[in-house]
Amino acid sequence: MGRRSGGRKLPFFASNASTSSSTKRTRSARRLPSLTRPRASSSPSPASPSPPPPSASHPAPPSPPLAVSPAGAGKVGKKKAGARLWMRLDRWGVSETLHLDKGSIIRRAGLPPRDLRILGPVFSDSSSILAREKAMVINLEFIRAIVTADEILLLDPLTIDVIPFVEQLTHHLPLKNLVCGNGQPGGDDHGEKHDDSPGDQVPRLNEATGAEHELPFEFQVLELALETVCSSFDVNVSGLERRATPVLEELTKNVSTRNLDRVRTLKSDLTRLLAHVQKVRDEIEHLLDDNEDMAHLYLTRKQLQNQQVEALISSAASNSIVPGGTSLSRLNNSFRRSVSIATSMHLDNDVEDLEMLLEAYFMQLDGIRNRILSVREYIDDTEDYVNIQLDNQRNELIQLQLTLTIASFGIAVNTFIAGAFAMNIQSKLYSIDDGSFFWPFVGGTSSGCFMICIVLLWYARWKKLLGP
């Protein structure tokens, strides 16, 4: 059995087995140019076909540069320099986290580099909503994202403040009513059904702009972002209101350094929160004042325009009626004009939908701002009340000081009289030895000084320098 199994080797492999490993490498290296010789020297006559090469029946091994080694695989998975963590979520609910650098983001979303600086740490405290050709840049407090017509790229999705926004995105996506051409059979307003036409592969513009009650993908993301930011503001304002009530009541009862420091911290937090709310409110107000900016935020409409124009051009190019390139260019211009007219019919409605969305959150932010201002007014009223208390105490101290000054003046007059008679001068009063003059004199001077104090106090009350 061993002999038979050993004797079944093919002659080709038997000859290869007898050669060395270096001969194998040499033959395999020589075989590569031999594959191209018959093709280069093959004659056009079919009478003498060239025999196929020996290696034609066997698939050629892959080229060495395409083979990925384990070390190469580790380099591919390594994080690039300057890359940041992003989460990608499309309208169908498919999400993934990946590290992307600025160049990848610029190529993916078609944004200029200056827009990515807005999402950097330098402008982290600013609030802005920018509309570009293919994307919308959202920088609202802790939410920094790039939204296109089909997906959202969220920066730093694992932070504590951004996690509620991620949960809302995953809860609301995928969209309930996706406007796609291949999802439902197409039909126009006259009941005609389109079969096997390129226009069926593209969403219809009237369905995406006017007929759908559901907002486009980018507006839904914007709504969730504004809702998350407003909810965060609401929670912070509620916390400040709960903190403010006991602190201010304690301050009215006891004006101490500790209570004043607590009120100072509360007031600084309130001022900082008011600044953040005011920034978001001003950005929404800026968008509401400019209808053109709101129209540029409609990314789905732009995408549908481009897709419809491309579909109509491709269908016209495949039509045999079109004779040449000149007619095709004219037809291209006519198609673009027709699409622009169709989109302008729905432009006001789209802007109205976005305007209603922004006005709702503008009113909510305005209400949050009014709550902050009411708490601030409460703090100001408490400070005024404390200042009134301090002024009252200061007035009482001044009255006490005035009373003591008047009493000191009377005592000083009595002391002056006693000091004058204590001097070593000649007087007949010193010859009186029975003491009948001393006590009446002391009593008279003391009574006179007391009367002086009474007169001064009465004068101070008459001038309302002292309280009743």
Curated annotation (Swiss-Prot):
The keyword Lyase does not apply. One of its GO terms (cellular component) is membrane. Residues 187-197 have a biased composition (Basic and acidic residues). GO terms for molecular function: magnesium ion transmembrane transporter activity. Keywords: Ion transport, Magnesium, Membrane, Transmembrane, Transmembrane helix, Transport. It comes from the Eukaryota. Residues 14-23, 31-45 have a biased composition (Low complexity). Pfam families: MRS2-like (PF22099). It is found in: Membrane. The keyword Phosphoprotein does not apply. Residues 46-67 have a biased composition (Pro residues). The chain crosses the membrane at residues 402-422, 437-457. It is a multi-pass membrane protein. Residues 1-76, 182-205 are annotated as: Disordered. Putative magnesium transporter. Belongs to the CorA metal ion transporter (MIT) (TC 1.A.35.5) family. This is Putative magnesium transporter MRS2-G.
